[in-house]
Structure formats: structure tokens, C-alpha cells
């Protein structure tokens, strides 16, 4: 009996070593998911092509009524439908100063709608909604970097306008007096500032602020 036991010891050692190797590999696979699992995780958190191209209601696209639709999938489908299948990339983007002006006007005049602000800043109401919804605020270093970037952008645009011979837009300075706003001056680069000039943009601004106070 003992002779057969000792004779089988090498096989038992090999079997135990194999089990340890299997358990170690299983732990490694548990700690570091494979590329296939990572791709599967990303796919499960994204919308499929069939879901994006389907014209059926959102509630029937996932689970077919047998399970609840995840909230993230509802939001993605609704946004995809709202943008007509295109990515959010507006042609006109407001500068940081203009975005701050949008927030300031909305804070001071809560009754002012996104459509009113969109008409004045010549952007879509969706752009205004996203600006008001955003909570991110740049720190001091990021603000300096953005200012330098916009300064370089302004220099580049001036050079392009000078080369093409186009007339740059007029610069309008707005001053606040309590809860009222007024156009302080209208300047054209290369000319002296002119105060008290009634321009279409000035009239639109006063009309916009007057309508919000009603």
C-alpha cells in the first residue's frame, strides 16, 4: 500500500502544480480583463446600428417591453433623434466671454428664454441650453491659455481680413446701469468711436431687454 502511494507522489505533485497554474491564470484573467471583454463592455454601453436606424419608439427598441430601458440609453436615443443622427458640432461657437454673457443675462433675467438668447447671439437654442447646463469652470492656468488662444485667433482673423480686403465687424461696447443695459459705444477698427448711434444691433438689444422686463 505504501509503495503504491509513494510511487504516485510525482504524479500528485504534477497535478497540484497544474492546479496552481490554473488558479493563477484565472486570477490574472480576473484582475486584467482581456481585450475582447473590454470591447464587449464598450459595446454594451453604446447604441447599436440597428437601434440608431430604427424608427420605432424608444420604449420598444430595447427589451421589447420585457425589461426596463436603461436611462442612459433613453437619453442617447433621444439626443440621436434630436440631432437627426449627426454628431453635435455647431458651425458657430461662442467665445468664453460670450458664454459668460449668456449666463449673466439668464441669471439677471430668468424670464428670458433660450430662443431669445439664441436669436441675439445668432446660434441655435440647443447651443444656449448646453452653455447654461455646463458646470465646468476653468482654473487660472486654463483661463490664461484660452485667452492666449483667442488672442492668436483674433490676430489670424485680422490678417485674413486685411489680405482679403473685407470690412471687419463693428465692435459694440455694452454698459450696465443697475438692472438696465445700454449700448455705450459702437466702434469700427480704424475709425473713431461713435456714441449714441442707432444701429440695427443696438435696436435689437434694447428690444430684447425691453421684452424680458415686461
Curated annotation (Swiss-Prot):
Residues 1-30 form a transit peptide. It holds the Pfam family Neugrin. InterPro entries: NGRN/Rrg9. Its main location: mitochondrion. Required for respiratory activity and maintenance and expression of the mitochondrial genome. Belongs to the RRG9 family. This is Required for respiratory growth protein 9, mitochondrial. It comes from Eremothecium gossypii (strain ATCC 10895 / CBS 109.51 / FGSC 9923 / NRRL Y-1056). The lineage of its organism: Eukaryota, Fungi, Dikarya, Ascomycota, Saccharomycotina.
